[in-house]
């Protein structure tokens, strides 16, 4: 085990004093579960500094990796775990904040569509899902982290950067800002989905003008 990826929703990265006990199987919250896993790993490898994990937090909150680390520290203190373990947890492990940007609307429910995809793929996949073409995963991490992750070799759009903040600012101001800017007028004009809005010259022209004159100049 080298990498832990979490996506427990915005509510998953939370600490509540007393909600999980050290000997509880399993602890209630994800941060408590992770703290216990890290403690067992620390014990099994006798605190070896090279046995830490890379922890990629994908929850949609600011500084998700740092917030997860704070929660783990709170549980370690609640459980009176020794200072040597807490030091190992914070220094041998890498808690990475990340930004994930891809819309995944859900599994395919139409049997005919599923059958056509299975025939095209040549196999049956019970977990087949649908996602938009665009996707990006920005991981805030130290030098050398990219070498541990297989994404670059796979050719997917994943970046390891020293600071995820400017990438989040770009997403919020361009993508989210564009949607917020045209959605009210588009809805009143009878449009229900973004695709149809982008096929309308007036709405698309308004959005482009708004982005170039109001959004992009502030990034």
Give the location of each predicted region.
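Substrate/ligand-engaging "lid" and interaction regions
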Residues: 1-216
């Amino acid at each position: 085990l080298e990498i832990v990826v979490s996506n427990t929703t915005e509510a998953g990265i939370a600490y509540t004093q007393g909600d999980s006990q050290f000997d509880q199987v399993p602890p209630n919250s994800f941060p408590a579960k992770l703290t216990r896993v890290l403690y067992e790993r620390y014990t099994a490898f006798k605190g070896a500094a090279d046995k830490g994990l890379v922890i990629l937090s994908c929850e949609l909150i600011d500084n998700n990796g740092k917030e997860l680390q704070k929660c783990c520290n709170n549980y370690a203190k609640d459980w009176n775990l020794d200072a040597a373990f807490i030091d190992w947890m914070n220094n041998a492990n890498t808690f990475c904040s990340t930004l994930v940007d891809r819309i995944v609307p859900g599994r395919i429910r139409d049997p005919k569509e599923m059958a056509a995809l299975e025939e095209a793929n040549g196999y049956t996949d019970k977990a087949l899902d649908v996602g938009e073409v665009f996707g990006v995963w920005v991981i805030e991490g130290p030098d050398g982290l990219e070498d541990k992750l297989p994404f670059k070799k796979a050719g997917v759009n994943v970046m390891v950067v020293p600071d995820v903040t400017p990438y989040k600012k770009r997403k919020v101001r361009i993508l989210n800002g564009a949607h917020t800017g045209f959605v009210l007028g588009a809805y009143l004009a009878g449009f229900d989905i973004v695709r149809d809005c982008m096929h309308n010259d007036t709405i698309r022209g308004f959005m482009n003008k708004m982005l170039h004159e109001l959004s992009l100049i502030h990034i």
